[in-house]
Amino acid sequence: MLALQDSPARRFLQGLGSRLARPKAIAVVSAHWETSGGPAVSLATLPATIHDFGGFPRALYEIQYRAPGAPELAEQAAALFEAAGIAVGRSAERGLDHGAW
């Protein structure tokens, strides 16, 4: 399991961040965030870590991914969708599911 066990892939990903410029934000599209009215953006300033899975080692449920949100950029993204005629929901409560972290 990549998140818990040492492997060449995990070591590569751990070192990758120091070799890349720090982004202002990262857009994540998640199939785990279902809404009834189309796409939605998260306006959370510090999204919670959501453990939306079952049957894995306890250590996986203890991982906390403390990535800052970017509400201003999320609003800009929502505005672009709306300018294209696509209604967009907004949520300040939604956290990051395991597809994101």
Regions found by a protein language model. Name each.
Residues 73-101:
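Internal, conserved structured core segments that host functional sites
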